[in-house]
Amino acid sequence: MLEDEKITDAQSGEADPAITPSSVASASAKKHKKKKKKKAGEGKDDQQRETKTTEGETAKQETSELTPDEQLSRELDWCIEQLELGLRTQKTSSKQREEASRALKTLRSSKAPLVKKRQVMRAISGDYRKKIEEEKNRQFKLIQSAMTSARVTTVSECKPVFHRRAERNTQPKNKTDGSQETQSSQETNEHTKTEDTKPFVFTKTHDEFCFDFDL
């Protein structure tokens, strides 16, 4: 009996895998990774929900700020734009063009009742209010992406630079030239004065005086 119990214990020991610290660490790491993935997915979902809610709130605020007359004119303008773009860009048959031109006339006319205009708008573009909101959201996203991608660069102001000119020493030269000229003029004047003020001295000669006449 004891031998049978020993054999069963050995078989059970061989069947159960050995639990090592490395296996425990790997299992905990796998669990941690799964938690991280779940958190990242939840964060992305939350961001998408927040963006959707903000876009819906902005659209609701814009529509609530507008009066019913303004909202109607805006919707009419949008439907008219869509019809004009379709006529310009899309290839349509003559029948479709006639229908589009009639719809444009009814939408632009001031005598047509509002009920008829709304019927035409629904027949042309279906749920036009939903499409207008979608277009607003697209434009809003484009503006946000442009704002994020745009980089503001500060331009360094040009500092003023002052240059000194080398002053030429011309004045002292002029002074020296003037002094030299005055000195030379003074010397010439003195020389002429001395020549003029010399006394006349009579020198005697031994030659006899006689008139030089031919007789």
Curated annotation (Swiss-Prot):
Pfam families registered for this protein in UniProt: DUF4615
Compositional bias of kind Basic and acidic residues: 40-63, 167-178, 188-199
Basic residues bias spans: 29-39
Domain of life, per lineage: Eukaryota
Region annotation (Disordered) ranges: 1-72, 87-111, 158-199
InterPro entries in UniProt: DUF4615 (IPR029274)
Family: Belongs to the UPF0488 family.
Name of the protein in question: UPF0488 protein C8orf33 homolog
